Amino acid sequence: MSPKYRRVLLKLSGEALMGNLNYGIDPKVVQSFASEIAQVVQAGVQTAIVVGGGNIFRGMKGAAAGMDRATADYIGMIATVMNAMTLQDALEQMNVPTRVQTAIAMQEVAEPYIRRRAIRHLEKGRVVIFGAGSGNPFFTTDTTAALRAAEIDAEVIFKATKVDGVYDADPHTHPNARRYRSLTYTHALTHNLAVMDSTAIALCKDNDIPIIVFSLETAGNIYRALTGEPIGTMVGGSCEIS
């Protein structure tokens, strides 16, 4: 099947990069993700990525342990750059041209985030990985994904996680939890569903950017989502709740 979208933003959780490890980065998992992303690029789809840092450091946990919240968030932003560089290396080993742009200047290892330059890279067929979050504390990488998607005019956000969609309750603690096939932004917000944080969902709603939540643990899911195959959960303004 041919791709349904021309330009996409993929949100990868940091935890997904751990694989079965308790901490850090599993190189085999990164290589697997890179292979799937390469397939998307080879299909001619312009691909941007926002990666989290929770496999290395999570600002909220640091703050809960007594750290200054802003300081903890900045450390978390640096963790996302480590993940971005790791993914860049894996992609370039597969001959996929990739650029890392960071919201905090790190000129020795990455370009600064410049919207027009990012779009130009995408138009030239390069993958762009956005690191360091939005550059501001108190904002999640989910919100960064929504922000960058709006800025680069992405048609959809793919949120690839360890869960196969959005449920009406935590499936780990509620065996009878029901997975949604589709739902609206408003329903996700009013019922506090675990799609993204509320700021990110509101930003997607305001800019009419659909979100597809699916599991990365099934090989080929990124491409399936790209072709419009019904996997995971679709969140959008005109979606039926089902």
From Swiss-Prot:
Chain residues that bind UMP: G53, D73, S134, G135, N136, P137, F138, F139, T140, T141
Protein name: Uridylate kinase
Keyword flag Kinase: yes
Pathway annotation: Pyrimidine metabolism; CTP biosynthesis via de novo pathway; UDP from UMP (UMPK route): step 1/1
Catalysed reactions, semicolon-separated: UMP + ATP = UDP + ADP
Entry GO terms, CC: cytoplasm
GO MF, one example: UMP kinase activity
Location of the protein in the cell: Cytoplasm
Record keyword Transmembrane helix present: no
Keywords: ATP-binding, Cytoplasm, Kinase, Nucleotide-binding, Pyrimidine biosynthesis, Transferase
Organism: Thermosynechococcus vestitus (strain NIES-2133 / IAM M-273 / BP-1)
Record InterPro entries: AceGlu_kinase-like_sf, Asp/Glu/Uridylate_kinase, Uridylate_kinase, Uridylate_kinase_bac
Transmembrane segments: none
Gene Ontology annotations of biological process type: 'de novo' CTP biosynthetic process; UDP biosynthetic process
